[in-house]
């Protein structure tokens, strides 16, 4: 009999994911796992990477005591180690799973400060972006205390090493191994001519540095925290840092990072 490990399942709306979640739930109940959505030990994501990101943000304020495990039911599951055909293997892995052997990935802390003194703090697993709704974004970019540049363009993306394979990669950023404790700044359609200049290439920023963006006072900024999008105005500054917060993945059938990258983007090498 299971020793009472507490789990919770989160799925997406596809029929395949619903069926997989239902089947896995029945297996786990038969094996006497405890279902707890308030204080789970392991959150099982059934779907794709978007589902895993949603699960992470649902438990964003419990990351110090929650581990995640992904079952993917689609075409691309960078954060998922199992498929919908591996459900009995999932149960076996949960029996054998040891919290001390969890895999940890760094998160970026994002602090948004407003002109009235109000602040919000979020953490992201993939990336955070800032852009304007329809016009050119203008903002000063500081690396720690140094004014690095005045950016003009569609926006900026700041990503984690694991997030470097997501939106960051699609806008020309580099792929960075999670062992490299750093943040990456990638420009979104920067404006470069004889009048206005930006660096024009991605930047890898060291662990101890902070990145601060001070946007011009406009009222139509769009900020994303992974897959979550918010509209803000009166933003004074946005500070990005690595504060030591991590997400923990159950080390059940963990696939090495470069193997994940190869399988996700290259496929079979002949």
Swiss-Prot record:
GO cellular component: cytoplasm
Protein location: Cytoplasm
Binding positions (NAD(+)): 49-50, 54, 126-127, 152, 154, 165-170, 189, 227
Keywords per UniProt: ATP-binding, Cytoplasm, Kinase, NAD, NADP, Nucleotide-binding, Transferase
One Pfam family hit: NAD_kinase_C
EC number: 2.7.1.23
PANTHER family (alphabetical): NAD KINASE (PTHR20275:SF0)
Protein name (record): NAD kinase
Organism: Lactococcus lactis subsp. lactis (strain IL1403)
Lineage per the UniProt record: Bacteria, Bacillati, Bacillota, Bacilli, Lactobacillales
